[in-house]
Structures are given as C-alpha cells and as structure tokens.
C-alpha cells in the first residue's frame, strides 16, 4: 500500500511540476520581445535572395545593415544596384544614386505596414497585430487582421539576442530571404542615422 501511495504521490507531483512549468513558460511573443531587448543595436553584412512561388531564385543582393533601438536604422544595398535607406526615428530617406533621386517619408508612414519595424523598436502595441509562434531560434509572425495584405515574417534570433536574419513570405508564396553575417553588437554612432541630400539630386518629398 505504501509503495502504491508513494508511486501515486510521485506521479501527482510530477504532473503538478510539469503543469506549473508550462504555465510559467514565456510565450513566443514574450520570448521574442525579451531577445530583441537584449541588445541596443548592431551592425552586420547581409545577403538577400528572392525566391519565386515556383522556387526559382529571381534576385540576389548584398549590403550592410545598422540598427540602433529605438527606431534608427541604415540599410545600404551594394549589389546588384546601389541604394540607401536611412531613418533617424522620425524621417526616412530612400536614396538611389543611379536615378539621382531621394524620396523622403515619415517613418511611421513608410514602416507601419511591415514587421521589419519590430527589429528597430520595442513597442508593446506592435505585438498585438501578429500571432507569434516559435521553433527553436525562429519566430514566425502572422498578421491577425483578416484584411491584411501582409504575408508571414520570420525572425531568426538566438538566445543571446543576436539577429541572424529574417524572411518575408508574401501571400502569393514569393519569399525574401535575408541572412546576416559579421554581426557586431552595440549601438552604431548617431551620425550613421542622418542623411544630407547630395547637391543636384532630385527630391521627392512624400511627407504630408
């Protein structure tokens, strides 16, 4: 009788501990938020692939990225075409040397429709727009709005908060795959997030 009681008690304790652990485990949303908050910023090289819905590589690219939280980023593409995207937290500049044009937007205006902004800021309300799941170091974000035109957004970030890359999966099945290398943690200098319009360049100001 004592053996049976001990076995039952042990089983009950195991079940209780398992339930307690599961109940207190961080949700995927909380875990992703925690990892993103571990580092104030980083810089890295990136490589890019665009894969068609049929599985063919239709474009490849490379460049550098610099991020400082909250809301500062510099995205410089060096191949196949040179262009630059810079945000100081309020204004966003998109510069294309080839066509000698700078387009200017309010950052909110340009980024409110993309989860890329989650890599650059830590705003609680952002997370309400997505259903988040986790598989290892990969977090998948799916928009909750029924009428959303966004597809899925996947972030690869390790337990130390180092972002390894991200994927954008459109609703039609096209994929944009971005992989980071030579990641350096720490906030880049503030002057990396400012932009001066070069002389002779056409300005397309979309702020309203």
UniProtKB/Swiss-Prot annotation:
Q: Can you tell which superkingdom this protein's organism belongs to? A: Bacteria
Keyword match Signal:
yes
An example Pfam family from this entry, by short name, is: LolA
> Transmembrane region positions?
none
Arranged from A to Z, the UniProt key words for this protein are:
Chaperone, Periplasm, Protein transport, Signal, Transport
Cleaved signal peptide residues: 1-25
Location of the protein in the cell = Periplasm
Listed under GO biological process in this entry are:
lipoprotein localization to outer membrane; lipoprotein transport
Q: Which terms in the GO cellular component ontology are assigned?
A: outer membrane-bounded periplasmic space
Which Gene3D superfamilies does the record match to this protein?
Answer: Lipoprotein localisation LolA/LolB/LppX
Q: Indicate whether Plastid appears among the record's keywords.
A: no
Described by its record, this protein's role is as follows:
Participates in the translocation of lipoproteins from the inner membrane to the outer membrane. Only forms a complex with a lipoprotein if the residue after the N-terminal Cys is not an aspartate (The Asp acts as a targeting signal to indicate that the lipoprotein should stay in the inner membrane).
* Family, per entry: Belongs to the LolA family.
Q: Oligomeric state and partners? A: Monomer.
Which HAMAP family has this protein been placed in? LolA
Q: Name it.
A: Outer-membrane lipoprotein carrier protein
Q: Which organism is it from?
A: Vibrio parahaemolyticus serotype O3:K6 (strain RIMD 2210633)
């Amino acid at each position: 009788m004592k053996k049976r009681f001990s076995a039952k008690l042990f089983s009950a304790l195991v079940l209780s501990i398992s339930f307690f652990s599961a109940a207190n485990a961080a949700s995927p949303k909380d875990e992703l938020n925690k990892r993103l908050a571990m580092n104030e910023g980083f810089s890295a090289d990136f490589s890019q692939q665009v894969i068609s819905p049929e599985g063919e590589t239709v474009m490849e690219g490379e460049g550098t990225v610099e991020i400082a939280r909250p809301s500062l980023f510099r995205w410089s593409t060096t191949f196949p075409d040179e262009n630059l995207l810079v945000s100081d937290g309020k204004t966003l500049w998109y510069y294309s040397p080839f066509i000698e044009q700078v387009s200017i937007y309010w950052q909110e205006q340009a980024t409110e429709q993309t989860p890329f902004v989650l890599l650059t800021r830590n705003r609680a309300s952002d997370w309400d727009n997505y259903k988040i799941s986790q598989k290892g170091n990969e977090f998948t974000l799916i928009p909750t709005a029924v009428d959303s035109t966004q597809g899925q957004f996947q972030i690869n970030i390790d337990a130390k908060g180092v972002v390894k890359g991200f994927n954008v999966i459109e609703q039609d099945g096209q994929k944009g795959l971005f992989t980071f290398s030579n990641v350096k943690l720490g906030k880049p200098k503030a002057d990396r997030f400012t932009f001066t319009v070069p002389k002779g360049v056409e300005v397309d100001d979309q702020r309203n």
